[in-house]
Curated annotation (Swiss-Prot):
Lineage: Bacteria, Bacillati, Bacillota, Clostridia, Thermoanaerobacterales
Superkingdom, taxonomy of origin: Bacteria
Protein name, UniProt field: Phosphoribosylamine--glycine ligase
Ligand binding (ATP): 133-194
Domain ATP-grasp: 107-313
Length: 417
């Protein structure tokens, strides 16, 4: 079977790696891919936004299944485009991907179908939002409605901070049209959790749980990032909690979308807060998480391609997922300055020294025969162990073997577990 993976980050490297372990996969293409992915797949120089070109490539190369990594092409309607031409593609339709593409849409669905989430108000006018922020309790969370690469969520402690964020979104328009609608949400307290499930339109098959580390600095300080590390399984979720999440959140949202005339197929990712009142939804995403995927997929024993096919064919109820009885720890190495301004093009040394962990490339490329940095998050080291402590020790031991100018990573991933 020929498979095309769309994307070029650490998540896509983990997907390509998992696919490469399937006997049924003959050839993997990845668009655009990166320096690490290029060792397992043929990288194709087409960006994730170029849907028409991706479709042409899939047709010309007789691709059997396309798997979409990032959210942007999903929200832009890549699945609808491919299906129109009879191509098999894994991911939700444009309408279904709205669950991630518009936080306001997701909140409306949750409110209508009583899916547990924080109280909220949405504004499309600056003055109305400002008036509300003058009168509200603090802290609150302000979110851009649309896609913002994980950087459109702000916790604000007082009106001064709130006005700064509002100006950023609605006056300076740093997120462009994504900030045309702004959500003000109550602050939820507890432990964060990421839950992923395969959804075939009807059935929900939950994956291994995970926990990610969003803040750039240790002790969860500093600005939000796309994720600085992750661990799997999530130490705060037991069987009872997972069951509650499935019955009160995952299944109800799939049902709610169906009632609205939207069939959801692909991966559903619920970002949750485990509060004293039970799990509540922070956000929904329409794809695999990054960097959670890098911790989850190495633990998967079931053939990945088989799961993808069962999802597309509506046959998930016949499938049972099998997992390694181990813990996974993923530590992300980033460029100095990330998530703000950073320089690229630095040579990465020591990659071949890593023997006891997986290295999943994110912002890497080839230049003059050398692997160099090309993004904010450069790579992730993923180690498995019988305990979080063992996996953590291996991950940090291995990451020390790799260097590039300005390398930065958090030293507290999986600490205390």
């Amino acid at each position: 079977m020929k498979v095309l993976v769309v994307g070029g980050g650490g998540r896509e490297h983990a997907i390509v790696h998992k696919l490469s372990q399937s006997d049924r996969v003959e050839k993997i293409y990845c668009a655009p891919g990166n320096a690490g992915i290029g060792q397992l797949a043929e990288c194709v120089n087409i960006s994730v936004e170029e849907i028409e070109k991706l479709k042409e490539f899939a047709l010309q190369n007789k691709i059997d299944i396309t798997i979409v990594g990032p959210e942007l092409p999903l929200v832009e309607g890549i699945v609808d485009e491919f299906e129109r031409t009879g191509l098999k593609i894994f991911g939700p339709s444009k309408k279904a991907a709205m669950i991630e593409g518009s936080k306001y849409f997701a909140k409306q669905i949750m409110a209508k179908y009583e899916i547990p989430t924080g109280r909220f108000k949405a504004f499309d006018r600056y003055q109305e939002a400002l008036k509300f922020l003058k009168e509200t309790w603090y802290p609150v969370v302000i979110k851009a409605d649309g896609l913002a690469q994980g950087k459109g969520v702000f916790i604000v402690r007082d009106f001064i901070e709130a006005k700064e964020v509002l100006d950023l979104m609605m006056k300076k328009r740093v997120f462009g049209p994504s900030g045309d609608i702004v959500i003000v949400e109550e602050m939820l307290y507890g432990k964060e959790a990421s839950i992923f499930a395969f959804v075939d339109g009807e059935n929900v098959l939950t994956m291994m749980t995970a926990m990610d580390y969003k803040k750039v600095y240790e002790k969860d300080e500093g600005p939000n990032t796309g994720g600085m590390g992750s661990i799997a399984p999530n130490p705060h979720i037991d069987k009872k909690t997972l069951n509650e999440i499935e019955e009160k959140i995952l299944k109800p949202v799939v049902y709610a979308l169906k009632k609205e005339g939207i069939v959801y197929k692909g991966v559903l990712y619920a970002g949750l807060m485990l509060t004293k009142e039970g799990p509540k939804v922070l956000e929904f995403n329409a794809r695999f998480g990054d960097p959670e995927t890098q911790a989850i997929l190495p633990l998967l024993k079931t053939d990945f391609l088989e799961i993808i096919e069962a999802t597309l064919e509506g046959k998930l109820k016949n499938l049972k997922l099998e997992w390694e009885d181990k813990k996974a720890v993923c530590v992300i190495a980033a460029s100095k300055g990330y998530p703000g301004e950073y320089k690229k093009g630095f040579e990465i040394r020591g990659l071949e020294e890593v023997k006891e962990a997986f290295v999943y490339h994110a912002g890497t490329s080839f230049k003059d025969g050398k692997i160099v940095t090309s993004g904010g998050r450069v790579f992730g080291i993923v180690a498995l162990g019988d305990s979080y402590k063992e996996a953590r020790e291996i991950a940090y031991r291995e990451i020390e073997k790799i260097s590039f100018e300005g390398i930065y990573y958090r030293k507290d991933i999986a600490a205390g577990y």
